[in-house]
Amino acid sequence: FDIVSAPETALPAEAKITLVNRLARASGMGGMAGGQALDLAAEGSSLSEDEILRLQAMKTGALIRFACEAGAVIGSAQDADIERLGEFGAAIGLAFQLADDLLDLTASSEAMGKATGKDAAAGKGTLVSILGIDGARKRLAGLVGDADAALEPFGARADTLRATAHFIAERKA
């Protein structure tokens, strides 16, 4: 918030207000903080697929969505383009979390550089625990497809973003 709202930040006042508002929503009770509260409240209980998706959209999805929208706002993009980039960010946010959950079950601790199997050991509900590994991989491919579709109007200008979505889904650690 400090950087976005600082007087020396070279952005028009309207852009600063838009960014502060979007960051507040992404990080507040409708975003990361609310998602974390849901996550903590759900410890020890099983969540439905919809509940897991909502929680993940509020946490990782909201922050990555904001990052994508922020670049568009700073670049003075049209509202429709800001929305498309937000959709891209939401899709890759969910894809990142799903890929992370898959790696937690399928990758070695050595490859990950951290302990794996923590979610299962803690009884934490994930999409992988509901869909299974194959179902989760199919869902992950669908999320990458959603991300690609959101970028369609941008053509080749969005190739780096497309590559980012594919990297997230295909990473091994």
Residue ranges and their predicted role:
Residues F1-A173:
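All-alpha prenyltransferase/terpene-synthase fold signal
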